Each structure stands twice: as structure tokens, then as C-alpha cells.
Amino acid sequence: MRRSFIGVFALIALSLVATACSTDEGERLIAIRASVDPAVGDERFLFAVNEIDGTRRGSPEEAVTVEAKALDAPDTVYEVEADFLWMVPGSIGLYRAAIPFDRSGQWEIDFSVSTGEPTQPFLVLVNEQPSTVAAGDVAPRVATPTLATTEPEDLTTDYPIHEPFYTLSLDEALDNGRKTVAIFATPAFCTSAACGPMMRQTKEISASYPDVNWVHVEVYEGFNDDGFAPDLEHLAPAVVEYRLPSEPWIFVMDEAGTVVSRIEGVLAEGELEALLDT
């Protein structure tokens, strides 16, 4: 079944409306969740910080501390320091907090900023299981277009094309005994600003890991066809099989083709390398 598809910025916009309507304290900073698919076992929660009028805040200089608790276990409070990740360097970014979601249900997320400005707590629904393929799952073997099967201009909306990302089909990569990194992104049709930066980062990192399979999966098919629209009907088969609710995503698989990690939205410096070095 094809799922609804939403980008990081679209989710932030929807959350901003909901949060703004929930409080009349216009002086408070609000946090907007950017993680689309939080689930039990995740320790990677992304959020933006905004002023109530929508002005984007956040930088490495504005330190943020998070307190998180499940509403059905309010006596257990997790306090973590969030780190700031640039989405578009020098322009837009998100905070990442390693919250140990250990139960499903509604969680209250409170946060404080080093500027001392008042903030507004918010709620997050944590699912028992993620919507996407999860760590520990056998990665779906899905054929994806390669340079051997498809004209370069029909492979990707990332230009100029980085040919090493299109030498292997994803199903071939998962069965050749090497680690695999699958990047699901669509630079030309991204509903967030994150696809292009993620592609640039992974291309740079891949040069240091020649023994790893690197496969870019364009989110949509037929993007050069007349009448094309970036909608659910044009989702690539691999996007459907991996049950992606948004873009971009990275999935890291071990030598046996088992999912080791999933990374949503924005990539921290050294985050992917740490997974590949283990």
C-alpha cells in the first residue's frame, strides 16, 4: 500500500500551525518536530526551534537541553543535550536529541535554550514499530535503475550525475557480501531543503569507503515524462518497499543485507562514518 508522503519542511509547517494554535503565549519559543517516524528504540529525534511568528531559530551557538517523558510514566524523565545540525550550511538547521524512547504512546518534550527565553513543551506520538523498514530487518531486495539499464538523464535529478552511485542495483548490492548505503533522495523535487545537502555529503564520504556499496535511489520514476507530477503514483518501487513517509532517508546495511541503521532528514558530521567503521 502506498503511504502518504511528506517532507521535513511540510511537517514543520503543519506542526507550527498546530503548536501556534495551542498556546496564546506569543513570547515563547516553540519546537517543531522534524522526525516523521519516531518509534520505540529510536535515539535520534530531530526538531526545529521557531519563534511563534514562524521566524526560524537555531545555531551551534544556541545550546538546547531537552527533557522528555512518557505521559504514562511521568516520573521517568530523560534529560539530554541536543546538538545542532546544519541542513543548509549557514542558513537552516535542526536540533538532534538522543532521546531513549523506551515505550510507545504520547511523550512530552520540553526544552530550554541557552538564551534563557521561555519555551513551549510539545507532544510526540511514539509508535511501537516504525513505519519504515527498521534496524534488524532484512533489507528488501528491490531492483533499482543503473547506468547499464537506464539513460543517465533518467536515473537521477542530481546533476552532474555521480556515476559510482548507479553501478549496482540495490538488490545486487545487498547480496554481494559488502556493506551497503542506500540514499533515498530527490534533489529536484525535495519537499525539504535536505536532499541536495545529503547527496553532497554522501558523495564526499563515499570516496573514503570504496569497499562499501553506494546506491542512490531517486524517489520518483518518470520525472522526464510529459505530465509527470511528484506524487504517490510516481513513487519508485524501492521507496514503496521501504515504506518511506518522507525524504530524504539513508539506510545502512551490513554484509548480510540486514538493516543496521536508518537516518532521516539530515546527516551529522561523522555519523555515517561511525556506522561504517564498526
For the regions a protein language model found, what residue spans apply to each?
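N-terminal "domain-start" segment that seeds a small globular fold
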Residues: G116-E172
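C-terminal motif of bacterial Sec signal peptides marking the signal peptidase cleavage site
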Residues: V17-A20
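Beta-strand-rich structural segments
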Residues: D42-T55, V64
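Thioredoxin-like thiol-disulfide oxidoreductase module
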Residues: V217-E247, V252-V259, E269, L275-T278
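Typically the conserved alpha-helix immediately C-terminal to a functionally engaged Cys/Sec
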Residues: S192-S208
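Ligand-binding face of N-terminal immunoglobulin V-set domains in extracellular IgSF glycoproteins
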Residues: E81-V113
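Bacterial signal peptide processing site
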Residues: S22-D24
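Short active-site neighborhood of thiol/selenol oxidoreductases, capturing the structured segment around
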Residues: H162, L170-T191
